[in-house]
């Protein structure tokens, strides 16, 4: 039986293993024939969605890995808009709304309210938090 998963990532791209472990879990789930419809980045996890993260050449680029996984498997990548704004991760729409000249939300990520997380909790067979 194939299950539909949603993931919640609370850890930042670097300084914590949460995002890396969530990514590895996602790969394993997909390899077993299940699907992931949404990854919701919350609290410090929104830092995974910054286009300004520049890891060293010998380090894993977890943001790029999330982007590629999402493209290959049609997974929604959402950040909590309130948590993102507090941490300086700004989408184009929010930049315009707040009259900012720049935005730095990485390609493939969308900003959403906690309603996005609530939807995941109700729609999916499993929701796993990292």
From Swiss-Prot:
<dbReference type="InterPro" id="IPR017463">
    <property type="entry name" value="Sulphur_relay_TusD/DsrE"/>
</dbReference>
<dbReference type="InterPro" id="IPR027396">
    <property type="entry name" value="DsrEFH-like"/>
</dbReference>
<dbReference type="GO" id="GO:1990228">
    <property type="term" value="C:sulfurtransferase complex"/>
</dbReference>
<comment type="function">
    <text>Could be part of a sulfur-relay system.</text>
</comment>
<comment type="similarity">
    <text>Belongs to the DsrE/TusD family.</text>
</comment>
<keyword id="KW-0808">Transferase</keyword>
<protein>
    <recommendedName>
        <fullName>Sulfurtransferase TusD homolog</fullName>
        <ecNumber>2.8.1.-</ecNumber>
    </recommendedName>
</protein>
<feature type="active site" description="Cysteine persulfide intermediate">
    <location>
        <position position="80"/>
    </location>
</feature>
<keyword id="KW-0963">Cytoplasm</keyword>
<dbReference type="InterPro" id="IPR003787">
    <property type="entry name" value="Sulphur_relay_DsrE/F-like"/>
</dbReference>
<dbReference type="GO" id="GO:0002143">
    <property type="term" value="P:tRNA wobble position uridine thiolation"/>
</dbReference>
<dbReference type="Pfam" id="PF02635">
    <property type="entry name" value="DsrE"/>
</dbReference>
<dbReference type="GO" id="GO:0097163">
    <property type="term" value="F:sulfur carrier activity"/>
</dbReference>
<dbReference type="GO" id="GO:0016783">
    <property type="term" value="F:sulfurtransferase activity"/>
</dbReference>
